[in-house]
A protein has these predicted regions:
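NTP/phosphate- and nucleic-acid-binding module
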Residues: 1-295
Length: 295
């Protein structure tokens, strides 16, 4: 199927070893793993589209999003999703779509999980397959329609706490990229390249041997914009209700594509030790005194 990879054992084992590096960092930084459904109801997509369109317009015009009304513009993932509209021969009352990412699904649950300042910070992550109808030329590991996706979502008491989370995410990136032996650039994206639903985006680009860059991860600061749309509030220490501030951090199998591009050539691929499916140790065999001196 175009844009949907078949993983053979060697490649899948390598990908799982990369995942293990991420799991380790998540455990160190007190993130908890979750798993959300693949299908999301259509009404949540409409909610996201209205929010993202308004945030995008506000950023372009340099005004506060609260000063704008919801627009009819489709600024979310609507043009990229795969739809499920039938169950057997029966048409569904509410169409479902395959998740392109999980903000809408997760943030529907956050108001049930967050009630007090004692519930913060909330730090969760999942590793799942997501689906986006990528209309451009697909390429294994680099631009696909079924994505092996890591996503971390956090909620915090205020903007400053969320900003500190972004810095922690960047430290996590440093650790993982060091294990993968990938040189990177971390850069705040300009307005036109910021995720439409974010206050700002920091992209992480691997520097490839030909001098070009390949984005391998991204961190987004949402401030309280999504919390207002999904009514995610908490009671602060003064018994007043406030909206949480949120962040996200994502990576995909593009990491493996970067590893292949960096450490492979026409003669083959040399894996970094941390993700090599097979480990080889060369042991010198010493038999004579003369050979001992030589070694």
């Amino acid at each position: 199927i175009k844009g949907m990879d078949v993983w053979r054992p060697y490649g899948w084992k390598t990908m799982k070893l990369i995942d293990s590096l991420t799991h380790k960092q998540m455990e160190i930084t007190d993130h908890e793993e979750v798993n959300f459904p693949l299908l999301i109801p259509e009404n949540l997509l409409e909610k996201e589209n209205a929010l993202v369109a308004r945030l995008k317009k506000a950023r372009e015009e340099g005004v506060d999003p609260d000063e704008l009304r919801d627009e009819d513009e489709e600024g979310g993932f609507k043009k990229e999703v795969y739809w499920v509209k039938h169950a057997g021969e029966n048409e569904l009352d509410i169409p479902m779509f395959l998740r392109p990412t999980s903000e809408t699904a997760m943030y529907t649950m956050f108001p049930l999980w967050i009630r007090s300042h004692k519930d913060l910070p909330l730090k969760i992550y999942q590793m799942v397959n997501t689906f986006r109808y990528e209309t451009k030329q697909t390429r294994s590991f680099i631009r696909v329609r079924e994505i092996h996706f890591f996503e971390a979502h956090t909620a915090h008491a205020d903007e400053q706490c969320a900003t500190r989370q972004i810095q922690q995410d960047l430290n996590i990136v440093d650790n993982i990229m060091n294990d993968l032996c990938l040189p990177i650039i971390k850069a705040k994206r300009p307005v036109w390249d910021t995720f439409p639903g974010a206050w700002y985006t920091i992209g992480i680009d691997a520097i490839m041997p030909n001098g070009r860059t390949l984005q391998v991860a991204s961190c987004h600061h949402y401030r309280d914009q999504w919390a207002k749309a999904f009514d995610i509030t908490y009671e602060n220490i003064e018994a007043k209700q406030e909206h949480v501030h949120q962040t996200t951090y994502g990576m995909s199998e593009r990491l493996l594509g970067a590893v292949v591009g960096m450490h492979g050539d026409d003669n083959g691929l040399i894996m970094p030790p941390s993700i090599a499916p097979f480990q080889i140790v060369i042991c010198p065999m010493i038999r004579k005194n003369a050979e001992v001196d030589t070694v």
